[in-house]
């Protein structure tokens, strides 16, 4: 009984640990991103975060390719979100303001959204058609 309980506890603790960040590249720039691929991870997003490292963000993988929407409830950081198609090509970038509950959507269908500190894409002149490399193969 104790062995089974100990094993269950170890499995639970192991699965609760944070996964390693993804190493991504876009237009010659390297970045790290947490990977939000489940509904719960996407719903939580970057809520409550007070800061992001300079070249760090969160990559959201959506279950289907379509126009996707984001909001900033309980998110104190100004962010830019880039939307990418199934092929990793950037299709849209939007800026998001802290704590704003207005729902903002991509203009075109996307599989992924990458949230970074606001202005990250503009400062690097990364726009539509840029390819995001390093996305995990599902």
Each predicted region: which residue ranges?
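Bacterial N-terminal signal peptides
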Residues: 4-14
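Compact, glycine-rich, soluble single-domain proteins
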Residues: 19-138
């Amino acid at each position: 009984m104790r062995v089974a309980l100990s094993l269950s506890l170890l499995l639970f603790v192991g699965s609760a640990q944070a996964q390693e960040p993804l190493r991504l590249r876009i237009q010659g720039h390297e970045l790290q991103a947490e990977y939000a691929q489940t509904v719960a991870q996407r719903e939580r997003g970057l809520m409550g975060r007070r800061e992001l490292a300079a070249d760090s963000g969160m990559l959201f993988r959506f279950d289907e390719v379509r126009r996707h929407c984001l909001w900033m409830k309980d998110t104190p950081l100004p962010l830019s979100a880039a939307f990418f198609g199934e092929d990793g090509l950037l299709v849209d970038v939007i800026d998001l303001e802290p704590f704003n509950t207005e729902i903002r959507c991509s203009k075109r269908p996307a599989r992924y959204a990458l949230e970074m500190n606001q202005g990250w894409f503009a400062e690097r002149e990364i726009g539509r058609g840029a390819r995001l490399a390093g996305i995990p193969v599902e």
